[in-house]
Amino acid sequence: MSKHRIGLIGGTGLYNIEGFTNQKWVKVKTPFGLPSDDLLTGKLAGRDVVFLPRHGRGHRILPTELNHRANIWAMKKLGVQWIISVSAVGSLQEKYQPCDIVVIDQFLDRTKQSATHTFFGRGIVAHVAFAEPISGELRRILVHTSLAAGANV
């Protein structure tokens, strides 16, 4: 298994993680402002983990108000190499039931509705490949671990 430092971004309803030890809340300043909340560092199953409640503790930030750049920058600043983002969502497909786990391999980036959807600009020009935005290795680990835990994946 990889030794990458893991970042967890919790969506609606995920504010605490069972088994998270050595917890310490850390305030991280970024060039893009403050992230949604302080970041919680600690250990989970022996791994270094950084947790961020996406909407802030108390669910006080609307999805359209999220500072995605600050959230990602803060994770990177704390040494995170992989981010697992958890969301409570629905589906129009009946094959997916409540509590099923869906591990995506592609997504539609709707943050482009915002004027601040990139880390570049102000004299910095870059083109980032987006054909495979999900790490294949991380996806395999998530699927394997979820199935081993008895989840419907």
Kindly label every feature range from the protein language model.
Residues 133-153:
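Active-site rim beta-loop-alpha module in soluble metabolic enzymes
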Residues 1-130:
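Metabolite-binding pocket within alpha/beta catalytic cores that recognizes anionic/polar moieties
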